[in-house]
Structure formats: C-alpha cells, structure tokens
Swiss-Prot record:
Domain notes: The DHHC domain is required for palmitoyltransferase activity.
Enzyme class: transferase
UniProt cross-references to InterPro entries, sorted A to Z: Palmitoyltrfase_DHHC (IPR001594), PFA4/ZDH16/20/ERF2-like (IPR039859)
Presence of the UniProt keyword Transferase in the record: yes
Keywords associated with the record: Acyltransferase, Lipoprotein, Membrane, Palmitate, Transferase, Transmembrane, Transmembrane helix
GO MF annotation terms: protein-cysteine S-palmitoyltransferase activity
Organism in which the protein naturally occurs: Rattus norvegicus (Rat)
Family: Belongs to the DHHC palmitoyltransferase family.
Record protein name field: Probable palmitoyltransferase ZDHHC24
Extracellular compartment spans: 40-52, 159-166, 217-284
Source taxonomy: Eukaryota, Metazoa, Chordata, Craniata, Vertebrata
Function, in words: Probable palmitoyltransferase that could catalyze the addition of palmitate onto various protein substrates.
GO biological process: protein targeting to membrane
Cytoplasmic face of the membrane: 1-18, 74-137, 188-195
Length: 284
C-alpha cells in the first residue's frame, strides 16, 4: 500500500530543474534586452506617438503574461481539497492506488505532482505544474501572450543583431544564428555578441513553440478533448464548438484572451462532465 496523497511530498529536485532553467533563461532575456536598450544601439527609431504605443503594448503584454502565469501557478488542478467521498460513483470513475482514492472521469495521476489531476491534460515541465480543469484557461492565454512577448523582444533586439551581422559575411551570419555556442567556444564572437544572438534565437524559437502549442491546444479546445483523449481518438465529451469553448473558458470565452482577471466562471466542477447525449446532440 502506498502512502495517501495527502501525506506525500511534492515533486523532487530533478523535476524542478526545468523550472529553474526557465527562470534563469527569462532573467538572461531581461538582462540582454536592458543592456541593448540602454547601452547598445537602443530601440528602433520611432515617432513619439509610435513609441508611446509601443510602450503601452509592451506593458499590456507583460501584464497579461505575468497575470496568466500567476493564475496558472496559483490554481490547484488536483483532487486535493475536493470532496470525492460520498459521491455517487458512475461510469468513468476509477480507483487510484497511489492516491488511495476514488477519482472522477477524465482524471489522471501525475507521477511528478504525485497526485491525481482533475481533467488532466499534461504536466507542463517548464512551469512545474499539471494542466487540468482549473488552470486550463490561464495556460492557453499564457501560450498566446508568451508568443507575443517573445516576438516583441525579438523585434526590439533585431536592430542590434542586424548591425552585427551586416559587418560580416553570409557564412558568419548563418553560423552565428545556428551555432552561437560553437562561435563562442572557438573565439569567433565576444560574450556580448553571443548573448545577443542566443537571446534572439531562443526568443524566436520560443515564440514558434508557443504558437505551435497554442494551435494544438486550440484544436483540442474546439473538440472538447484532452491530450490523452486526442492520442486515443476519444470524442466522448465533444459538445460542439460553442459548448466546448464555454466548458473550458466560461461564458466570456471570447474576452478572456484579452485580460487575465476577467470573471468568467467555469460551468462545471471538474468532476462531472456533460456528454453529447446530455445536451441533445445525439438523437436516436
């Protein structure tokens, strides 16, 4: 018999390493951006009104990014504190031997979090937390605004990178963009030049990854699926596009993308889920 989930510790140090690396990378990006803006070529030349709009956009993006990240990390998607005992067990319920508890449909046990997650989608290793029923909305919005912030940073750093690349050959440009570490180790670039190329490379790659993740999870959102259900071709909870959006994002699903603190309560509880039959989408 394993220990009940309430008595077990949280994920160990190895599982936290991606979170540490994510935080360190974010710090490097901020330092490089500050260095280029203050001591380097500075931001692209703009008119005062355009500059004010750019600053407003940056502040808006940053607020959305940090707001959704905070909501994601503060939301507990697990069965901790959820009254499961005494509920009428129906189809889809199962017994988790690790948690020593009955768990509802669409739940899954996470070996990193060491607890079952309500409507578990996957474990986000970069943030060290599972994506489930209660934090799916901020996770999706986080992908959107992370892609926007990373692209904005790439644009702000592009004049400095362009000035560096114009002074060298095409082969040097390709090598610096694709193999900045090798260029640094062989002494072809300075540490400052390497940092600039590395940050721009990772920001562009990060934006592409966030964009791809947003497209993938947007598809799942419209289909009413989790990643686990998608991998197994299950469509048991597909209520149609409109119902699926409201089930995951609340009644204000079209507005939650623009402001992280907008009230849009979820219609469910993460324990019971409607099926197409319940909403009259299946006829005999």
């Amino acid at each position: 018999m394993g220990e009940p989930w309430a008595a077990r510790g949280t994920e160990g140090a190895p599982a936290r390493m991606p979170v540490v690396f994510t935080a360190l990378w974010a710090a490097v990006v901020v330092l490089e951006l500050t260095y280029v803006m203050v001591l380097g070529p500075g931001p692209p030349p703009l008119e005062p009104l355009a500059r004010a709009l750019q600053l407003a956009l940056a502040a808006y993006q940053l607020l959305n990014l940090l707001g959704n990240m905070g909501l994601f990390l503060r939301s507990d998607p697990s069965i901790r504190g959820v009254m499961l005992a005494g509920r009428g067990l129906g189809q889809g319920w199962a017994y988790c031997y690790q948690c020593q508890s009955q768990v509802p449909p669409r739940s899954g046990h996470c070996s990193a979090c060491r607890v079952c997650i309500l409507r578990r989608d996957h474990h986000c290793r970069l943030l060290g937390r599972c994506v489930g029923f209660h934090n799916y909305r901020p996770f999706l919005c986080l992908l959107l605004h992370a892609a926007g912030v990373l692209l904005h940073i790439s644009v702000l750093l592009s004049p400095a990178l362009s000035a560096l690349l114009q002074a060298h050959s095409a082969l040097y440009t390709v090598a610096l963009l694709l193999l900045p570490w090798l260029m640094l180790l062989t002494g072809k670039v300075s540490l400052a030049q390497f940092a600039l190329a590395f940050v721009v490379d990772t920001c562009v790659a990060g934006a592409l990854l966030c964009g791809a993740g947003l497209l993938f999870h947007g598809m799942l959102l419209l289909r009413g699926q989790t990643t686990w259900e998608w991998a197994r071709g299950q469509h048991s909870y597909d209520l149609g596009m409109s119902h699926n959006l409201q089930a995951a994002l609340g009644p204000r699903w079209a507005l939650v993308w623009f402001w992280p603190f907008l009230a849009s309560p979820l219609p469910g509880d993460g324990i019971t889920f409607q099926t197409p039959t319940d909403v009259g989408l299946v006829t005999s």
